[in-house]
Amino acid sequence: MGISRDSMHKRRATGGKQKAWRKKRKYELGRQPANTKLSSNKTVRRVRVRGGNVKWRALRLDTGNYSWGSEAVTRKTRILDVVYNASNNELVRTQTLVKSAIVQVDAAPFKQWYLTHYGVDIGRKKKTPAAKKDNAEGQEVEAAAEETKKSNHVTRKLEKRKEGRTLDPHIEEQFGSGRLLACISSRPGQCGRADGYILEGKELEFYMKKLQRKKGKSAVA
């Protein structure tokens, strides 16, 4: 039969008279959803649409460009997991990438950028006093080596950048785990990409609460 977007085949709820029947038209066609899956075997299909235009239907993806708004930086990174979807839990269970889905992305590219831009290694776990003593000598040598690598100009530049540096504690916490919460803002089934932005501020707090509540429910069940 095929998916049709016309209303001719629908019954009237009021029991009113049907229109005169005619065959389906090409411009009334519908296509099944892409249901883009999270998979390393990247698959994108070319679809010819009305007017000779082209859409890119992503069937499997695992990477995307994600922007960190407050730092005005964008990096290509791996999508690790789909954790929340406001419209449908089934899309989380089946790891489906759709617009506005909340995903976890790899923090490594952003961590690397932060280190080169500010000279600060974020997300490092604090060690116990015993471990500190053992590693103190090795760290001193490493620190000395790092200092010798940087010129005065670079050091001055980093110090100036550090003056205005602010970092959301929630984001810093996520850097420790190596996974950042992000939102997909592109439409993978239409443009063939799963791009988005890192969650920050009130939006991040909102979704963290949602995930915490979801985790609590599953623990009770």
UniProtKB/Swiss-Prot annotation:
Biased composition (Basic and acidic residues): 146-169
PANTHER family assigned to the protein according to its UniProt record, in alphabetical order: 40S RIBOSOMAL PROTEIN S8
Protein name per UniProt: Small ribosomal subunit protein eS8
Entry GO MF terms: structural constituent of ribosome
Chain intervals for the UniProt region annotation (Disordered): 1-41, 128-169
Cellular component aspect of the GO annotation: chloroplast ribosome; cytosolic small ribosomal subunit
Family membership noted in the UniProt record: Belongs to the eukaryotic ribosomal protein eS8 family.
Gene3D superfamilies: 3.10.290.70
InterPro entries the UniProt entry points to: Ribosomal_eS8, Ribosomal_eS8_CS, Ribosomal_Se8/biogenesis_NSA2
GO annotation, biological process: maturation of SSU-rRNA from tricistronic rRNA transcript (SSU-rRNA, 5.8S rRNA, LSU-rRNA); ribosome assembly; translation
Biased composition, class Basic residues, residue ranges: 8-26
